[in-house]
């Protein structure tokens, strides 16, 4: 609602909630962009029917868009239930990954310039797969931290305030808070939020160590300048992400 009488009617119908035009505008922009993305994926699916490859991936993309639309709806109707919010987040990452895979799949028909062999990187494949798993786990922990409004609990580095270990509870961190009317601003007690935040910081330390090792080894063993630059770009993104993560605690 944008008019005063409509806002008053909405406020009277839902007295426990407060109308926030700024949040409503952001939500509508998100919905319009999501709808545009859905139309683009539908067009990709239609065009892929006439292509020799990429049909299965395009069909999976369309199915994932439908699932994402449902998760987006449940995010609202279930009042920001954390498990739905995290699933919606992972759906977005999966969409991006599948679009990149589709681009790679459709680009196989084009002739590629000869590239130098990379025997030095073959042994790094297990470490690369480990980095992918660790990164996905850290993204999940970050989404769980945000969905449960646990980001502002710990203010000291490297893990939390003194005495956190005595109150840490793994069961509380991964408990599913069900049956609440709304999950906005979080419903978990301090111990659970603190445990979630500590796990996220531990995950950040592990992810930083694994990714930094992979970047340094790729820079050292890669034969092509292109791959060395790509490794440097990943390292720069890692430094940026760590900086953004520790900045709130440093500023405070």
Language-model features, listed with the residues they occupy:
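Polytopic transmembrane helical bundles with strong interfacial aromatic enrichment
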Residues: 1-252
